[in-house]
């Protein structure tokens, strides 16, 4: 089932992950744990050769909270949108095709409290609908943002709930 949440730095593997054995270790050729088997890509519900594991360094960050509180609260911003591709950059008259255009901001989210703005209008060019406005994130804590995954990876690696972040 798609939860809508993506796992930054997820490891793709061909190791068999079937119902009942997720949560097991993913080992490298030296027998070292590099991840925790988590999910499969399947239309039948069984292993079809594509599995995914949470990296062990991510698990190390999360496990103490799970042991202590029984849950882990992920840092989040509260936005959805789209990466700036060359077509969108042209339409928005941007110099570079990089960054993340905010389409929606979740009410009450950190993004909402910070005053970030989502899209409020669209424009049609050559029969294709494009966003006409909305804030564009081009950096996070002085690191360049080329796409949403740059933001998600930064949140996962560097931030905890309640931490400030400069966009």
Name each region found by the language model:
Residues 1-23, 29-74:
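Active-site loop architecture of trypsin-fold serine endopeptidases
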Residues 15, 28-29, 33, 58-167:
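C-terminal recognition in membrane/secretory proteostasis and scaffolding
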